[in-house]
Regions:
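Double-stranded RNA-binding/processing signature
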Residues: 1-124
Length: 124
């Protein structure tokens, strides 16, 4: 899986993280869809993902760190709209690590990583 293009890993990781956040918010909420959408956007935007990556960086495996490094340095030909380039690159690294673990089928690892984020950032 480490030979996959890091931007492909980020593409998958972004989708999985978005679904995870939406599921998390819906589980314990009676809010309407519009309100849930606004809350979810706070956690799937590049600024938030960059902060989440910094929370996870110290506990990443060597392989995850290499994937994050490759993703950060990949040229996506897309420029950020609502964040800095540095935040965008960290968000891409976060998404790539998520995508890597998702494609490996390592859902236990994803749960552990997401638990760290939820604990640190109080998602809800």
């Amino acid at each position: 899986m480490t030979d996959k293009n890091p931007l492909v890993l980020a593409f998958v990781g972004d989708a999985y993280w978005t679904l995870y956040v939406r599921n998390f918010l819906v589980r314990d909420s009676s809010a309407k869809a519009g309100a849930l959408h606004l809350r979810a956007n706070k956690y799937v935007c590049a600024k938030a993902q960059a902060a989440f990556f910094q929370t996870l960086a110290p506990v990443l495996t060597d392989t995850e760190t290499q994937i994050a490094h490759r993703a950060r340095n990949a040229d996506s030909h897309t420029r950020p709209k609502n964040c800095t380039l540095a935040e965008y690159k960290l968000a891409t690294a976060f998404e790539a690590v998520v995508g890597y673990n998702y494609l490996l089928g390592d859902f236990k690892r994803l749960e552990n990583l997401f638990d760290l984020i939820l604990k640190e950032k109080q998602l809800c």
